[in-house]
Amino acid sequence: MNAVDLPSPNHAPRPADAAIDVLVLHYTELSLKESLDLLCDGTREHRVSAHYVLAEDGMVHRLVPEDRVAWHAGRSHWRGREALNATSVGVEIVNLHGDRHDYPIQQIAALIELCRGIIGRHPAIVPRNVVGHSDIAPKRKIDPGIRFPWATLAASGIGLWPRPGARPLVGDVQAALQCLGYPPAFGVATEDIVAAFQRRFRPAKVDGIADPETRALLGDLLEQVGAQA
């Protein structure tokens, strides 16, 4: 993996009791230069950062050590926990808009190698805890976008992907989404959380409607993680 160090001043100590168990993937919505300038700018009132920035050519830029908190998740919730910066590693992937632009093959190959290394160092990052920004902040965020190849990552052992042929879930969809990890519908409508789920697991049709196909995908994923709504 080709990598270069570009230290950002934007980080903080991790809480003593915080185990790293979440990997959050983002897209930058900016060019590589603009992204690095922003994430390494220590003069802004609201500073942001990430542990890694991944260029389109596959070059990895290391900004913040993994044992430090980077400021990438913002208001966030996953599996009953909030403020996920404290327990996560954040990767910003250079892409101007992941709903419109494909991710280059060499970039995804480098991402898989990077993620494998992160997960190897932090085995508490189980497949269900490899998430997109849109998973942990429904409606507020949409990255890494519907063109992000989650299935390719899952085939390499990174994250989850539903299996075909599952039966539709019987039961409450909101409860099932919470069981998987999504936030409760406080301040965010259930439709927005369903849309976030579809954005990740059924990107061909993101409409916020819990139709039979969506229910089947959700039911299969719950089965994979051994959860029950």
Predicted region positions:
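Active-site-adjacent loop/helix surface patches within enzyme catalytic domains
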Residues: M1-R128
